[in-house]
Amino acid sequence: MANILEVKTKDGKLIRLTEKQWLHIKRRHPEMTTKIGDIEDTIANPTVRIQHSDETTKFYKFIKDEKKYIMVAVKILNGHGFVITTYKTRRL
């Protein structure tokens, strides 16, 4: 399956957004369908980055006009990163 997006994190890890996950995001979070650029920017230049113990990292970027964060959840396994989901939230 093709990748919709490939972007590097500040520490050089390559993160991919696959077509399969993009379909999931569009179905579950339709407000994100026009936000590919924001998703890319959130991964590349997050306001906040929270690493969890299960190989999941959450990247947040504050959107001033909306007073919300874009959250992008990423899983990194064996050096390969991929987007799990993304949505807007008021909380970290």
What is the predicted function of each stretch?
Residues M1-L92:
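Ribonuclease/tRNase effector modules and their secretory precursors
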